[in-house]
Amino acid sequence: MRAKLALTAAAVLAMAAQSGVAQTPAPKANIFPPWQHGANNDALNRGVEFTVPQIDDLADFHGDLTDPKLVLYVGGNYFFAMAPLVQAFEAAHPDYKGRIYWETIPPGLLVEQLKAGGRITSGNMTWTVKADAYLAGLRAVNGLIGQGLLTGAATPYVTNKLTIMVRAGNPKHITSLADLARPDVRLAMPNPEYEGVARQIKASLGKAGGDALDKAVYGSKVADGSAVLTRIHHRQTPLFLMQDVADAGVTWQSEAIFQEQVGNPITHVDIPDAQNTTAIYAGAEVAGAQHPQAARAWLEFIRSPEALSIFERYGFKPYAPGAAGGD
């Protein structure tokens, strides 16, 4: 019966195509954000639900803007961990339940938002929400403390490393960073202008193949169109792979693990430690924060055993003093 229905549906679609009747395209899979289907929204009252994946969504802006008691600017490469982290924080601090707002766009763009007084525009919407805490790479956090944008000491909490994200089954048989220079491999790579991870990637390319490999990936392949530069790699790279626009892209290991966990057709190729680059994640209170006590509570929580156990689900490692890295 199912086979007959499928054949009937196919016949109807074929007739519609021949007659010029428009059809709603059938999605290849549920590949478009928000990948956690609203779990990263902390609002207690969501009102009217209107989210159309690929068309109308704000996947990296979370919570209720009305009167938040804690505002977090979080580097986007652990957007997926924020829902369980916030849930655990609220269990320990119930006064904050439903009152936390956070953004997970690239850290460099979050710095621009800090400097703009918290004002940001996405599509046709402009709003202002000033951060209480900023969380990104340790080097960036220390730099912002030096500039006076952040205050107090940096709080390091976890480390992460790079991987090569590919489509499920690894159809191009990519085994190493050197393979990224192959002419038959299309790449999605973070843009150094917007995304700090590009610096770590370029360092790893240098370890794997010297300046020649770096120039091939970020020079020749960009110039000939076989590499596209992303502006928000934690969204674009997996999407470009699933849409068969790219064959590979270097990302943080945690991002690939998350894609595998949610069942998207993504896998990853490990990069040897000798060629890899480690990032140390840290946070600090924003100077002049409207909710300084809340910021300090979050920074204390983020390195707690409960928070670290959540991070470890996605391949992060707890920060150990003296660990190499810092980006």
Placement of each model-derived feature along the sequence:
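A short alpha->loop->secondary-structure connector
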Residues: 151-152
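Bacterial N-terminal signal peptides
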Residues: 8-16
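Short beta-strand
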Residues: 155
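Bacterial N-terminal signal peptides that target proteins for export
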Residues: 1-7
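Helical hinge/lid and interdomain linker segments adjacent to catalytic or ligand-binding clefts
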Residues: 118-120
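Sec/Tat signal peptide C-region and signal peptidase I cleavage site
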Residues: 18-22
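Exported/periplasmic ABC-transporter solute-binding proteins
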Residues: 23-103, 108-115, 124-130, 138-139, ...
